[in-house]
Amino acid sequence: MIEKSFKYFENKNIDFSINLSFHDISNEYIIDYLLYKLEEYNLYNNLIIEILENESIIDFDLVRNFVEKMKSLGVRIAIDDFGSGYSNFNYILELEPNFIKIDGSIIKKIHNCEKSFKITKAIVLFAKELNIKIIAEFIHNQNVYDKIFELEFDGYQGYFFSEPIEDITNYNMG
């Protein structure tokens, strides 16, 4: 998937993300391959690595070293599915991400659930205090978008903007 992603975005000059789990990050082969492909395609400043929040990180030192290495190369880090797991704030303290992507399970109810709105607002406020950009997942209608817009998110994603595009795994490698 790394090769296909890099090949697909090689000449597009846009940011793109790949998801990595703790298991992926702890696999030396995967990390060496990622570093090799980063050098080959020179996409350091376009890549955002999304670390899956809903998976337990067993070795924070290993992940922190990985994050520091990636950031030193210009790669940005996001915590994906923020709000879906148990260690959210610890992840922020330990990994110092560039982005937090708030999980759709919180966002999808923001327009008709006051608790969801207040929780989201609190996450946005603390993220801004820490200079972390915040992205809303699962924006599926105008009402949800209006609430997210009110909170001044940095980025948005969901069916309201576009249905998923062609799966990159189907991309013709040429």
Show where each model-derived region lies.
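Catalytic core of bacterial c-di-GMP phosphodiesterases, primarily the EAL and HD-GYP domains
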Residues: 1-62, 138
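Alpha-helical scaffolding segments of alpha/beta enzyme cores, especially the outer helices
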Residues: 7, 29-36, 62-72, 118-125, ...
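Alpha-helix termination/capping residues and helix-transition junctions
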Residues: 10-11, 40-44, 72, 94, ...
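EAL-family c-di-GMP phosphodiesterase catalytic domain
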Residues: 21-24, 50-58, 75-174
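Short, flexible, glycine/charge-rich loop motifs used to bind or transfer phosphoryl groups or to couple energy/partner
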Residues: 37-40, 68, 89-91
